[in-house]
Design a protein with these regions (language model features):
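Charged/polar, low-hydrophobicity segments characteristic of intrinsically disordered regions
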Residues: 2-9, 132-136
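Hydrophobic helical h-region of N-terminal Sec-dependent signal peptides
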Residues: 22-28
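OB-fold and OB-like single-stranded nucleic-acid-recognition modules
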Residues: 35-188
């Protein structure tokens, strides 16, 4: 085989078509490997250029006298979403992506795994603070799921992103994804 390859690259005019054919074949085989690598996104990439950026409403409790109000808020109806119809980046539709974030469970199995959840940019979104704009929420479906007790850490989610709105009891999402990989986010 090596002898045959060396002969192809020897440079004689009669053997150049074989060399071109071999190179074309190698490119065809290697292209899907490059294409399979997901595009790493951050949360600002989900906001269209020129669209207003809505800062998160993170209201920490500094005054202990407000503690009873906060505890009663836990049983109150969910806070209103900041921008339920925020614009989305249509060019991301169908792209293979990788996005870090926190998991907000929508469905939990008897085994304690969530297989349908919202991916959000910061911890506590939709639960302790109002939901972020819809273009900052991805509705995730996953066969493998994530254990509920592991929800306090951020995760990388990989899969094909769809620009498709969805609604849940907690918030509206501007994107959806069928998770192909879920793994812990670690600082570099």
């Amino acid at each position: 085989m090596i002898k045959h390859l060396t002969a192809c690259f020897a440079g004689t005019p009669a053997k150049r078509p074989a060399m071109h054919m071999l190179l074309a074949l190698l490119l065809l085989v290697a292209m899907p490997l490059w294409a399979a690598e997901p595009k790493e996104l951050d949360w600002p990439a989900l906001i269209p250029e020129g669209a207003p950026v809505v800062p998160p409403q993170l209201t920490p409790l500094h005054d202990m006298s407000q503690l009873s109000n906060a505890l009663s808020a836990e049983s109150a109806p969910p806070a209103r979403q900041q921008a339920p119809d925020a614009p989305v980046v249509k060019s991301l539709d169908g792209q293979q992506v990788k996005l870090p974030g926190y998991i907000v469970p929508l469905e939990v199995s008897e085994e304690g795994r969530t297989t349908e959840f919202l991916l959000v940019p910061y911890y506590g979104a939709c639960i302790h603070v109002p939901p972020p704009p819809s273009n900052q929420i991805v509705h995730i479906f996953s066969e493998m799921g994530v254990r509920v007790e592991d929800l306090y850490q951020p995760y990388w989610i990989e899969g094909k992103l769809q620009v498709r709105a969805s609604s849940s009891e907690l918030a509206d999402a501007g994107y959806q994804m069928e998770a192909e990989k879920i793994y812990a986010y670690e600082l570099r």
